[in-house]
Amino acid sequence: MDQGFRQWLTTVFRDRVKWDEPMSRHTTLGVGGPADALVAPETVSELRELIGRCRAQNIAFMVLAGGSNLLVRDRGIRGIVIDMKKYWQTIERHSDRGSGARLTVGAGLTLAALCRYAADNGLAGMTFAVGIPGTVGGAVAMNAGTAEGWMGDVVEAVEMVTGDGRRIRKEKQDLVFSYRRFAVRNDDTATPGPPVITGVDLGLGFDDSEALKAAAEERRRRRTATQPAGFRSAGCFFKNPEAGDPAGKLIDRAGLKGLAVGGAVVSEAHGNFLVNRGNATAGDLLALMETVQRRVADRFGVTLEPEVTIVGQ
């Protein structure tokens, strides 16, 4: 990153660019070395120009959403990290249809805020997401969900800026959702950099607000009872295998709950949570991940794939 590009970032983004920013401050795991620059665009125009200049100068960039499904290595990230949480938190309700309502939601809005809005306004369809950390944009990008529902169930359209700076909109018929994956049918977003989700249209039904709040509270209670509290984590660390027992059960059957490497430990509450006891490094978590993968593979012949995105050096 040359001095001219640094000067442009400082001139345009001022206090919205942070140099050598520790990523441990921006991930739910609380680990990770510094990013060369963390930049928070406020508008689509700023985002497009930032992406265009990165591409023109061959500077790598990645998107930071809620940081809840992200493990950054200890030496950090070279290039630009685009913060899509700070200024992208709007909710716009359109004219209701007979069967429900349509919302346009900023990619940086937290799932928690969206779930509260839906319940408060008698809009059904988001209860499955209660307790899932992160932002709407990040949740769509990985098709976050549970056995009770997925983001793909409620998404009607996605607005994006492509890796070459184009602003595009894709309707439901153009979108493909699968387990922990989102893609575009007949993809024209394929460019040297990833598309950046800026907004999402959601289709929600109608229900009694008090009933929705009660269902949300029950969902919250169940998650609290079965998942670790008091430690930093990324949520479920491994994808569930396509067949057979889920990852957490395999880890439990292998006797790995409580296994620790440095400050990282397999949660006693849920085997698919690798948690930071307060002093973990990314290296600790990666070493623990590899140990769990090896022990599960040796015992059951199953290779666990990480659900978290692992980035950096």
Swiss-Prot record:
Q: What class of enzyme is it?
A: oxidoreductase
Q: Which InterPro entries does this entry report, sorted A to Z?
A: FAD-bd_PCMH, FAD-bd_PCMH-like_sf, FAD-bd_PCMH_sub1, FAD-bd_PCMH_sub2, MurB, MurB_C, MurB_C_sf, Oxid_FAD_bind_N
Pfam annotation, one family = MurB_C
**Is-annotated flag, keyword tRNA processing?**
no
Which Cys residues form disulphide pairs?
none
> Where is the protein localized?
Cytoplasm
Checking SUPFAM superfamilies in the record gives: FAD-binding/transporter-associated domain-like (SSF56176), Uridine diphospho-N-Acetylenolpyruvylglucosamine reductase, MurB, C-terminal domain (SSF56194)
The residues covered by the FAD-binding PCMH-type domain are 31-207
- Cofactor field: FAD
Q: What is its main location?
A: cytoplasm
User: What is one Gene Ontology biological process annotated in the Swiss-Prot or TrEMBL record?
Assistant: cell division
Q: Name one GO molecular function term.
A: FAD binding
- Please indicate if the UniProt record lists Flavoprotein as a keyword: yes
UniProt-listed Gene3D superfamilies:
3.30.465.10, UDP-N-acetylenolpyruvoylglucosamine reductase, C-terminal domain, Uridine Diphospho-n-acetylenolpyruvylglucosamine Reductase, domain 2
Q: In which pathway does it act?
A: Cell wall biogenesis; peptidoglycan biosynthesis
Origin: domain of life? Bacteria
- What GO CC terms are in its UniProt record? cytosol
Question: Which residues are annotated as active site?
Answer: 180, 236, 307
Reactions catalysed = UDP-N-acetyl-alpha-D-muramate + NADP(+) = UDP-N-acetyl-3-O-(1-carboxyvinyl)-alpha-D-glucosamine + NADPH + H(+)
List the EC numbers from the record.
Answer: 1.3.1.98
Q: What start and end residues bound the annotated signal peptide?
A: none
Could you tell me the keywords of this UniProt record?
Answer: Cell cycle, Cell division, Cell shape, Cell wall biogenesis/degradation, Cytoplasm, FAD, Flavoprotein, NADP, Oxidoreductase, Peptidoglycan synthesis
Similarity section: Belongs to the MurB family.
Protein function: Cell wall formation.
* Protein name listed in UniProt: UDP-N-acetylenolpyruvoylglucosamine reductase
Q: Which gene encodes it?
A: murB
